[in-house]
């Protein structure tokens, strides 16, 4: 099972056990976080939210912080001997996806193929 989650404007496809690099969070390594904006739960019976899936959340553990690759910004003005070279390294938080939780009603719907009942 996988999920599409949105975190501060970015969308990520996550699965249980996956490690992921997201924008910097103010969280200590080893702490548990919750990604609550679940847009889609995929699998045999996908569940699409409008815009989010009610009661669904992704539980993750913070592994640590890291920096991304350097982006070089070079500015110059033609024929004027004006040259400026600067760089930027974006900071990220590495998280491990522990569990994809679906609410009780949605779990009931996802396990039943269309046309069948769950005996309840």
UniProtKB/Swiss-Prot annotation:
Lineage: Bacteria, Bacillati, Chloroflexota, Chloroflexia, Chloroflexales
Disulfide bridge map: none
Keywords tagged on the record: Ribonucleoprotein, Ribosomal protein, RNA-binding, rRNA-binding
Quaternary structure note: Part of the 50S ribosomal subunit. Contacts protein L20.
GO MF term set: rRNA binding; structural constituent of ribosome
PROSITE patterns: RIBOSOMAL_L21
Species of the source: Roseiflexus castenholzii (strain DSM 13941 / HLO8)
NCBIfam families: L21
Family assignment from sequence similarity: Belongs to the bacterial ribosomal protein bL21 family.
Keyword RNA-binding: yes
Known role: This protein binds to 23S rRNA in the presence of protein L20.
GO cellular component, one term: cytoplasm
Protein name in the entry: Large ribosomal subunit protein bL21
Gene Ontology biological process: translation
UniProt cross-references to SUPFAM superfamilies, sorted A to Z: L21p-like (SSF141091)
One Pfam family, short name: Ribosomal_L21p
